[in-house]
């Protein structure tokens, strides 16, 4: 079963986009992330799980995706919501620091590819009408605090899922309304 939760997030001009990206990275940006460790490694509820934050001109979206079995979809969905709620109170400074390092490493490593560099320059020019320096971007990433990420996590929990998509045999999956109720509790 393919499972996706999506939440409205900041647009690309909103300074909170860096907070959203750090939140998504800490929650599901790799093997050391909270969702990967708790849901995949500790509980074995899925074979893949990740989170990401995307931004557009007038809105943004933070999504969580997991691939699981029909037998595990209900438990996976509920534990995902529980981890989102927990992040609002116990996202650690170490998790945020690790996410910051991961984002900066990705940014710097992306500069090694001419096509990535060209795409970055074009994207930044179209968004900002200028090209912010790497140092400016790194400073924005470094300025995001653990408190900022916890506040963003609380905001996500308080605005219970905008959308859910399921593909596959998911008859035992909780409804979006059930997940919203669990998130708001």
What is each of the regions a protein language model found here?
Residues 1-34:
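His/Glu-based metal-binding/catalytic segments typifying zinc-dependent metallopeptidases
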Residues 5, 21-23, 39, 64, ...:
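Buried hydrophobic packing residues in well-ordered domains
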Residues 7-9, 66-68, 168-169:
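Short beta-strand-to-loop capping motifs
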Residues 11-14, 71-72, 87, 173:
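Short beta-strands and strand-coil junctions in structured, solvent-facing domains, enriched
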Residues 26-45, 56, 87:
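M16/MPP (pitrilysin/insulinase) zinc-metallopeptidase core fold and M16-derived inactive scaffolds
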Residues 50, 54-111, 179-185:
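M16/insulysin-pitrilysin zinc metalloprotease superfamily fold
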Residues 86, 104-185:
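C-terminal regions of mature proteins
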